[in-house]
């Protein structure tokens, strides 16, 4: 067995008990029942769409136009740009919050703990309304890109701070004590011993958090930023095709999230880490 595989099994077994034959049989039965139920629901929905005329060519023909897909591609690029920028900001801010919360300075610990809980507890939509409605009253006007990106980043930073902290807590305490016995400073212990191992543990979870960031960008219509959802709303207005457009957009978002989740699972297998959900 490879080093990575052994590590992965050890970490996974530490959190979850491996299912036995009976449990695996129950899982297979439950999966089969779920698939049948989902298939039946899909058939029912399609039947209702057919009855109400939503499957008519009238509501789908514009998807044969190249301009439609170019318009959606522009929105997709906008979504990716916001998600990556917000994710990068959240990564840095989340790490800073974790470092502050685990520092020896009591006031800094308190401030970072309060900020972490605040960012985690407040929906990103409320942050967007604050940037969109409140800040302009104080003569602070930001481009629509930043009115969407910064709120999404703040909401994600609180979650990432806790993920970082979970990774740090997963590092064996004995390694820290050994480094202290050698006279290393706390900064060197943190950045040369603890963080490299912690990041290895949490990389899959960090990638998975990008799924949440992508979902949070769907409220871009509030600030009229031309992302995938905003451009979808334009198509709906122009062609009066709500169901067909939203179905296509849903498929695109599902594919995006599947790719991100597959990346997280791949990294998990390579690093031997366990995805925190």
Question: Which stretches of residues belong to each language-model region?
Answer:
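Transmembrane alpha-helices and adjacent helix-loop boundaries
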Residues: 2-277
